[in-house]
Regions:
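Domain-length cofactor-binding catalytic modules of enzymes
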Residues: 1-171
Length: 171
């Protein structure tokens, strides 16, 4: 992540923590479209994150599904890389066409998830099953899950638009 993006994320996190009266005990930056110099060569990870021995990373799920903090195992067969997320099951255009709005609303309500700025192509229906994605990487010796995060608030870039039918804002 570039310095500008990193600083911006830190500001967002600092403001959020202040508003909810909490403090951070650790910060994890997770690059997923970046080139690293390693052993005299460059490794470009597009949609993948470093997963060296003990390297801490985040593998996000989607709106309504778990995300994971993981530790890498340095698997050379995966070029010491793990997935950055569940991965899409379809293109953004197709995801918008296939979205079952009723099912999405039922999911966020049943799990008491507050959403703002939801994009139709970013719902859980657009992604693979995160539990299976994590398990496959565990089975292949790529990573070890440290803990899972269960979504309660999802805020996306369109959060300031009014009237988004997919938003579930609780006042």
């Amino acid at each position: 992540m570039g310095l500008y993006a990193s600083a911006n994320h830190n500001l967002i996190h600092d403001h959020f923590l202040k508003e909810i009266g909490c403090r951070s005990t650790v910060r994890i930056e997770n690059h997923h479209n970046f080139a690293w110099e390693q052993d005299g060569a460059y490794i470009h990870r597009k949609g993948a994150t470093p997963s060296g021995v003990g390297e801490i990373g985040i593998i996000p799920g989607s709106m309504g599904t778990n995300s994971y903090v993981v530790a890498g195992k340095g698997n050379i067969h995966s070029i010491q890389s793990s997935s950055h997320g569940a991965g899409r099951v379809s293109s953004r255009t197709q995801a918008k066409k296939n979205l079952d709005r009723t099912a999405f609303k039922q999911l966020v309500e049943a799990n008491d998830i507050v959403t703002a700025g939801v994009a139709a192509d970013e719902t859980n229906q657009a992604y693979k099953d995160i539990e299976r994605v994590i398990q496959l990487q565990v089975d292949d010796g790529v990573l070890t899950p440290i803990f899972k995060m269960i979504p309660k608030i999802v805020i996306m870039g369109n959060a300031n638009k009014r009237g988004n039918e997919l938003d579930r804002v609780v006042s």
